[in-house]
């Protein structure tokens, strides 16, 4: 099989997989029963699996990945976090620049561990930013957003809410997009 054909098939497979995953998580988030398994999750392992899933597209676009994570762990549901990270990586790919870059880092505060995922893509216009987590919102209808469904970041927000995580986004137009996930620090109950 020729490399261009293989790349096209990888793209189609990835799109189908993402669409099915979104549908399943949409149904899961609407369900009255949840099967989350909260435990300590190694962020590098979790992120590595997500990047592996998107490897063909990341390689095709020649993404530079800057992973500044150490051996970070967070307490959350692994599948939920992987879904969130997958949607964020997918958006970085869809709205990438000519020399795409994805930077992942973490800072620690007294109240939360803060994961930052930042790309250097087209970003979101300032007047659209307050609405990016709303269902169906696709923002400015430029050519790059014509295929947008407005469901990805909505589902990321819903999953974050279910997992008791806080999200923030920043995006100077045409200078990238940054999404920040706040993992609250659990208070010790003194062994009780």
Regions found by a protein language model. Give the residues of each.
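Conserved glycine-rich
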Residues: 165-169
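Short conserved segment of the HATPase_c
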Residues: 124-137
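Acidic ATP/Mg2+-coordinating residue in the GHKL
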Residues: 119
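Short conserved segments within the C-terminal catalytic ATPase subdomain
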Residues: 57-66
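Conserved micro-motifs of the catalytic ATP-binding
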Residues: 31-36, 69, 73-79
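Short beta-strand/loop element within the Bergerat-fold HATPase_c
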Residues: 99-111
